[in-house]
Amino acid sequence: MFDEFYFRKSLRPRESQNHVRNAACEYILKFMKTEGTIVKTYHLGSSLEPWGRKFHERIDRTVFDQDLTPFVKYTLNKKKRWEAEGNPDILYGLQRSYQNMGVMVAERVSLRSTPHYCIVSINNYYRNFFDQFPIRHLHQLQDHNYQCQSTNSIRGQPFKSLQPENRTPTQVTGHQQESSANVSVAYHIITPPKNYEVLRNKDFRVGHSDRNGIRTIARRRRFQFMKEAVFDLKNEILEDFGDSDDDDENEILLCEESCGPRKFYNLHDHLVKSNHNE
């Protein structure tokens, strides 16, 4: 009876019921409850000639600037009509707006970084940017037929993994399927998963932040490693400085012992005696 009472009292609660542990995660990631971003992009086929900058600016203001400005991040909460994700009617409406172009809607996952504060390399920026947010569902029209490609992973997969030729058990060599449309318009809807607290809870430590404002385990370990490195460096400097002083003192003592006692005389007496002799 005592053992049962002791273990019930001493054991920590489950992670889902551990409110002390979930406090930091819930407080820091509370913005993810209502966060949502939509980005519109267009992609050119390899058969088209490269377009100049002026041509891109012109078509951005005319052809592709019908509802959203391309390559601009919009808050999803302000675009209420995009709440119906995966609705085929949206795709058919977009297809009527963009004749002879491919249209797709990609639902992406934001878990480790937010689209508005994402640090990526400026070289090939948009490719590196979208690599940070894998695709969970890909909606598109093929010959006016609605298709949806999904993944079982809640964290999503890259665009290449969702292609039909890459999902078959046998890879076809020497033949690569090309898109029928030379120009494609894509709408990227970036939202966090519903269970983001469960997926990110292990990144936060128990309790509140310390005096350094450290709330995550990774950042605490990084700061601890930096402190240990600085401490070791200081010890090495002090040890080297102390060893040099000891060596100098030992050299002085050895020199005094080897030279023996020195003979001194008064220079004033020597000068006085010299003057009397003259």
Swiss-Prot record:
Per UniProt, the ranges with Polar residues bias are 163-179
Q: Which UniProt keywords apply?
A: Immunity, Innate immunity
Q: What induces it?
A: Induction by P.aeruginosa is dependent on zip-2 but independent of several immunity-related pathways including pmk-1 p38MAPK, dbl-1 TGF-beta, and kgb-1 JNK pathways. Induced, in a zip-2 dependent manner, by translation inhibitors such as cycloheximide and exogenous or P.aeruginosa-derived ToxA.
Top-level taxonomic group? Eukaryota
Q: Where is this region: Disordered?
A: 152-179
Q: Name one GO biological process term.
A: antibacterial innate immune response
| Function (record text) | Plays a role in innate immunity by conferring resistance to virulent strains of the Gram-negative bacterium P.aeruginosa via the zip-2 pathway and independent of the pmk-1 p38MAPK pathway. Induced as part of several immune responses to translational inhibition arising from endocytosis of ToxA during P.aeruginosa infection or exposure to exogenous cycloheximide.
Q: What is this protein called?
A: Protein irg-2
Q: Tell me the name of the encoding gene.
A: irg-2
